[in-house]
Curated annotation (Swiss-Prot):
Subcellular location(s) per record: Cytoplasm
GO cellular component, one term: cytoplasm
Pfam family, one: Peptidase_C54
Species, as recorded: Gallus gallus (Chicken)
PANTHER family in the record: CYSTEINE PROTEASE ATG4, CYSTEINE PROTEASE ATG4A
Stated name of the protein: Cysteine protease ATG4A
Similarity remark: Belongs to the peptidase C54 family.
Matches recorded under InterPro entries: Papain-like_cys_pep_sf, Peptidase_C54, Peptidase_C54_cat
Sequence motif: LIR, positions: 375-378
Keywords: Autophagy, Cytoplasm, Hydrolase, Lipid metabolism, Protease, Protein transport, Thiol protease, Transport, Ubl conjugation pathway
Domain notes: The LIR motif (LC3-interacting region) is required for the interaction with the ATG8 family proteins. Required for proteolytic activation and delipidation of ATG8 proteins.
An MF annotation (GO) of this entry: protein-phosphatidylethanolamide deconjugating activity
Acyltransferase in keyword set: no
Amino acid sequence: MESEFPDTDEPVWILGRQHHLNEDKSKLLLDVSARLWFTYRRKFSPIGGTGPSSDAGWGCMLRCGQMMLAQALICRHLGRDWQWEKHKKQPEEYHRILHCFLDRKDCCYSIHQMAQMGVGEGKSIGEWFGPNTVAQVLKKLALFDEWNSLAVYVSMDNTVVIEDIKKMCRSPPQSSSTAHSSAHLHRSALGRNRNAAGLCTGWKPLLLIIPLRLGINHINPVYIDAFKECFKMPQSLGALGGKPNNAYYFIGFLGNELIYLDPHTTQSFVDSEENGTVDDQSFHCQQAPHRMKIMNLDPSVALGFFCKEECDFDNWCSLVQKEILKQQSLRMFELVQKHPPHWPPFIPPTKPEVTTTGAELIESTDKLFELEEEFEILSV
C-alpha cells in the first residue's frame, strides 16, 4: 500500500475527473482532500443509550457508506468541482451536509442511525456490515431526509432496471382535487415531494448503488476493465469494498492500482458549534491517499453513481451500454429497460406517512386527526 504518487504519464482518474501527475500533482491532491473523509470516532454518546461510544473495529463499512453518500450530497448542492480549502469560509450547504453525518442520534446519517437501522437488516449493533447491507441502510434512512430528497435505488441480482428508476425518480404530480386536500396538507407538513426551495420538481436526484460479486474468492480479471471504467464516468461516486472486515472507500485508479480513502483512524467526536458550523479539519484527508493493487480487492463491492437530473441518468445509461455491456459474456452487471416479469412488482419505497420522526414536523395534532380516514394512525 503506497501513498506518494509516482511520476508517470498515465492518467489518474478520481470520481469522473482525469488528472495528469506530470502536469499538476497539487491539483489532484486538492481534489482528493475536498472529499469528506469519515473515520472511526470515539467518545460519542452511546448508541441506543447503552451501546458502544466508539465504532473502532466495526464501523469501517458504515464510514465508507457515509463517504459515498456525502459525495452525492456535495455533487447535489455544491457541484463535483467544488474545492475545499483549509480555514476558508465554506457555504452554508457544506456545513449542513457535514451536519447530516455527525456522530449524534439526531443526525440523519449518523453512525447511530446507521447502526440502529442495521438491526432491521439482521445486524446487531457493533457487528461488521458488508457493502450490500450498508446500501440497504442508506436506502431506508434517505426516506427520512427531507432536505436532500434523494431517491436511492439499490440494484438486485446484478441488474439495473431503467423503468423502475424512472418510476422512482419522477416525482408524482401533486393532486389538486379537494378530496386529497388533507393528505396534501399533511404532505407539505412533512415536506414530501418538495425540494429545498419548496417547489415540486420533475426528477428526484438519484443515488444508484450496485452491489456486485466480481468473483468467488478473488476478483475475476475479466471484470477489471469494466470496474475501472466506472471511475471514469462523470456520475461516479466510486465504490465500497476492500478486504473482509476491512472496508475502504475507493475513489479512483492509476494503472492497475485503486485509490482509496481509509476510515481506519480513530479520531475524537466533533460536534457542531452553536452557529451551526463544524470544525472540519478532521473531516478531510490532507495527505496523499492510499493505493492498492486491484487484484487484492475482495470480490464483494458496491458501485455508486449520482444522477442529479434525468439527463445525467440517460447519459449514464448510454455510457454503460457502450462500456459495460460491450462484453458478450461475464458482464459486470446488466442494464435492462423493463422490469423482469418473474420479479416481484417494483414499488418505490415511501416513508410511513405518520411516524415519530414525522410527528415533530406537524404543527398541531388537529391536522393529524383530519387524516384519520386516509391513513392508519401509528403510535405517535
